[in-house]
């Protein structure tokens, strides 16, 4: 096998999860020589604006995909939730490895449970999806925008006027944070995860047969089916960063895929949700999308997209 060059964002989390995946590859092919090339994306450069307001689709992947096309790198290790639902022609997701915990972590300054926060308490999040679902269940709380890496957000929780923050559990775990800092992990009924949350997507050139053969050794087929249902739903709903959209699939004991899709308004007042089981992940994602469109969810998407 030739020496491989992996493209990664420069953030501490991106580099850490890239190294963790490289370690997984080396466990099956110990003699691999792999180098990480750090790439700064548009999303990394925007630190003072809410990403949903600057056209969030692909903000963290486009520059990396360009490096793949130019053959400056052989593969890219993405957080799958950052990857648009349509992959450019000539590239492919060569592997979906094991999924980290897909839920969100709620961290309170005073370790107060979410359901017991006083009226007017301020929750920090950078996600319309999280904000909408919290306001839907707890309309007496206030959502305040927060950006920055994990360390920055934890510091802002202590030094600024946030009573709690919500972060992806996967990032905390990959960075080695102890469960002790988490007040609670929010289950799917409280906060349905983002499409692909907790999963990695390993992107490479479609014609790189040698690399695709290697990647197949660390591919998790069950996780791939789940995220395919989720990403099909995202593509069918034409969900942009202006739309609070969530979707989560699991494999049942009967080996069926159970998928829940959710569309909301940012204020949490309108909510469209549907759950069903199936065996074909693409058909399942499409069917749940159609069910939500029948309920009127697509009108929300059109309205929100027109506002931006």
Curated annotation (Swiss-Prot):
Pfam families in the record: Porphobil_deam, Porphobil_deamC
Pathway(s) the chain acts in: Porphyrin-containing compound metabolism; protoporphyrin-IX biosynthesis; coproporphyrinogen-III from 5-aminolevulinate: step 2/4
Catalytic activity entry: 4 porphobilinogen + H2O = hydroxymethylbilane + 4 NH4(+)
Domain of life: Bacteria
GO function term, MF aspect, one: hydroxymethylbilane synthase activity
Cofactor annotation: dipyrromethane
Gene3D superfamilies in UniProt: Periplasmic binding protein-like II, Porphobilinogen deaminase, C-terminal domain
EC class (word): transferase
One GO CC term on file: cytoplasm
Sorted UniProt keywords: Porphyrin biosynthesis, Transferase
Keyword Disulfide bond: no
Modified positions (S-(dipyrrolylmethanemethyl)cysteine) in chain numbering: 241
Family named by the database record: Belongs to the HMBS family.
Other noteworthy facts: The porphobilinogen subunits are added to the dipyrromethane group.
Protein name (database record): Porphobilinogen deaminase
Gene field: hemC
């Amino acid at each position: 096998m030739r020496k491989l060059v992996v493209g990664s964002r420069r953030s501490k989390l991106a580099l850490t999860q890239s190294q963790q995946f490289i370690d997984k590859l080396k466990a099956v092919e110990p003699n691999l020589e792999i180098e990480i090339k750090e790439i700064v994306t548009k999303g990394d450069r925007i630190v003072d604006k809410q990403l949903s307001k600057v056209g969030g689709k692909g903000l963290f992947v486009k520059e990396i995909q360009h490096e793949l096309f130019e053959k400056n790198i052989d593969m890219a290790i993405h957080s799958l939730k950052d990857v648009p639902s349509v992959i450019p022609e000539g590239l492919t997701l060569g592997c979906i490895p094991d999924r980290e915990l897909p839920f969100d972590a709620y961290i309170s300054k005073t370790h107060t449970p979410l359901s017991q926060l006083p009226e007017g308490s301020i929750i920090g999040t950078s996600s319309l999806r999280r904000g909408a679902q919290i306001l839907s269940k707890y309309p007496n709380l206030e959502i305040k925008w927060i950006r920055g890496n994990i360390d920055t957000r934890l510091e802002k929780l202590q030094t600024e006027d946030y009573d709690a923050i919500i972060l992806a559990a996967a990032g905390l775990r990959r960075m080695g944070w102890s469960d002790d800092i988490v007040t609670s992990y929010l289950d799917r009924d409280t906060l349905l995860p983002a499409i692909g949350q907790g999963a990695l997507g390993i992107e490479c050139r479609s014609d790189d047969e040698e690399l695709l053969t290697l990647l197949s050794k660390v591919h998790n087929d069950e996780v791939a089916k789940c995220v395919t249902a989720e990403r099909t739903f995202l593509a069918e709903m034409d969900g942009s960063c202006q739309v609070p959209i969530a979707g989560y699939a699991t494999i049942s004991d009967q080996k069926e895929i159970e998928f829940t899709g959710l569309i909301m308004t940012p204020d949490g007042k309108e909510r469209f949700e549907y759950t069903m089981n199936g065996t074909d992940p693409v058909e399942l994602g499409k069917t749940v999308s159609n069910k939500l469109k029948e309920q009127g969810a697509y009108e929300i998407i059109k309205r929100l997209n027109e506002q931006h």
